[in-house]
Amino acid sequence: MSVKIHYQNTHFITSAPDIRHLPEDEGIEIAFAGRSNAGKSSSLNRLTNQKNLAKTSKTPGRTQLINLFKVADGCHIVDLPGYGFAQVPLEMKLKWQRALGEYLQKRQSLKGLVVLMDIRHPMKDLDQQLIIWAVECGIPVQVMLTKADKLKSGARKAQVLKVREEAKTFGGDVAVDAFSSLSGIGVDTLRAKLDEWYAPMLAALAEQEEGEQPESSTDQ
């Protein structure tokens, strides 16, 4: 028996100002991170087929909290604060960067990081710093180049290949694919990656379900 994830059932659990206020460090968490204009909220909404799971904002940098969502038993998505915005004081930027670093380095249940970047402006300094932190911590990374519908097919493929070459310089496990919350490009790829990262928890759930099945009687 296998347990399949129904991403449309994902729901919000809680918000926290920092790692110390998150629920217990258990199960499997997949973190989503990106610059404030990378389309992170729209990507989460498309992934889960929900219009308002993650609140989209016209104001970059609005998401100041760590938001936790339940995908399935023991499986969570963590929406990390956006970074790289211009309209926020330096002190707050530095505070958020420290919080991101602390989360990546200390959260034991973190098993994968999705970094969202605008396909037209990828691999900015903070994007690279985030990937470096993840690689140093042994965390696999899936880069999704968002707003892929903004480029024609040939340009899109060329940009993906270019960023993949850049990603090789980090070492570690860093994959790169195109994504569009508007057209659906890359949605199946992202779900497949999350399925892979959640697999150990799903296997444990399936085993637990089998253990709870009543034994069939062989008595005549």
UniProtKB/Swiss-Prot annotation:
GTP binds at residues 34-41, 61-65, 79-82, 146-149, 179-181. One of its GO terms (molecular function) is metal ion binding. Its cofactor is Mg(2+). Mg(2+) binds at S41, T63. One of its GO terms (cellular component) is cytosol. It comes from the Bacteria. Belongs to the TRAFAC class TrmE-Era-EngA-EngB-Septin-like GTPase superfamily. EngB GTPase family. Necessary for normal cell division and for the maintenance of normal septation. This is Probable GTP-binding protein EngB. It comes from Vibrio cholerae serotype O1 (strain ATCC 39315 / El Tor Inaba N16961). The gene is engB.
